[in-house]
Amino acid sequence: MKKKRTYILLIVALLISFICTACMWTEEGFIEEAEKYMKNKYNDSFGSSFMYDRDAVMMSLNKNQKIYVLVEYGDFKDNGTKEWGDNYLYYLHMDEIYKDTKEVIDTVYENSKIYIHINNITNNFPLDTDIVELYKRGTFTIYVYTDKDIVDKDNDVLKIIQGMYDKSMYCTIRLSYLRESDFTKMSEDKINEVSGNGIYNASTNLYIRSREQDSKWRYGDFKKDLE
């Protein structure tokens, strides 16, 4: 009886090992296919890949490890057919996105700092997709910081919404008015520090979908000084 139990446990262990190995190879194969798709589409190499979701892989651009791209095998046409998609196209247009954003922001603020983050939302757009089509998807978030006084903040917001809407840039803008000393220290790596510790005079989120929207302002409590 004891030997029989030992054999059963051994068989179970072998089965578990086999299943784990099979899953590992399935995952590796999926990642390999995702990297191959990106190589063929963009003629660029990607690596440091890992599973982000069941049907999605996160990977970085080999020549710029700071850029992480999401690649997904999904039903983009809602017809039951799956194909590869990604969000790297937005990174290729980053300079243009920044330029168009700055054109709007500069009409409102004398001093500003702008940081653009591409959201983890994929598409199957071809390489020659017009920038306006990318804008209409709205799958990016723009962080805007200024040291301007908050007295005209509501009018400032109206101008930003109008300017972005005119460019069909249907995105999310996280706008913050900072103290002059904090504005000087502000950098992209301090975004979470500012928002998490209330290091702002006033802050709001703008969702560029229409010209009319109410701004809900938050006022900072300055739990700490910006380092």
Model region roles, listed by residue range:
Residues 90-227:
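Extracytoplasmic electrostatic interaction patches
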Residues 45-73:
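Exposed beta-strand-loop-beta-strand "reactive/processing" segments of non-cytosolic proteins
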Residues 23-48, 96-106, 157-158:
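Short, non-transmembrane alpha-helical segments in secretory-pathway proteins
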Residues 44-51, 111-117:
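Short secondary-structure junctions
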Residues 64-66, 76-78, 149-151, 182:
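Generic "edge-of-domain/loop-turn" microfeature
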Residues 3-25:
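Sec-dependent N-terminal signal peptides of Gram-positive bacterial secreted proteins and lipoproteins
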